[in-house]
Amino acid sequence: MRKVNLKDVPEQERKSPKGKFHKFVKNISIALGREPESLDLAKRHPFDLAIVRIPKRKSYCPYHSHSAESELYLVLSGRGSVRDKDGSIIVTEGDAFLFQPGEAHQLTNAGDEDFVYYVIADNPRSGGSGDSCFYPDSGKWAVVKEGLEEVIVKGKETDYFDGEE
């Protein structure tokens, strides 16, 4: 058995240059021994578990969808706004919701206190999982280059055989 207490899991902070996006993440799966870059299933978990904290009036990240990853959310405290293709709804403590591959979403703190939730992902983006993210508002893609390194690209529509023959 592997065991860890949340108070012992380091919290990682990340925010955008202008501050619109700001989050604190405790990656529980890594604390339990998951090797992020390993393709060996014995060194990976079948899912990723993290606890996320978003400060007031901030968003986790831009509106996006995953190509191969499903994400299950469980709100622990605070008040959040969840945007999807149909608009935005408010979620609070005890609410659970799921996004499957191709379903664009964005989580934002809609309250005066931190918005805190668990997220469980079935297909971690690290390693060779093949997941990528699409950002509909900007037309960008995030793809895994090597290990955990992401490359952000913005393409234009082209013919399938362009540059191939």
Report residues per predicted region:
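Short, conserved beta-strand element in jelly-roll/cupin
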Residues: 51-55, 65-84, 122-124
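Ligand-binding loop in jelly-roll beta-barrel domains
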Residues: 101-127
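Structural motif
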Residues: 72, 79-81, 88, 104, ...
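Conserved short histidine dyad/triad with adjacent acidic residue
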Residues: 32-36, 50-66, 101
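Short histidine-centered beta-strand/loop micro-motifs
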Residues: 38-43, 61-66, 108-110, 134
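Short acidic-glycine-tyrosine-enriched beta hairpin
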Residues: 86-102
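A short, N-terminal "cap"/entry segment at the start of jelly-roll beta-barrel domains
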Residues: 1-46, 137-165
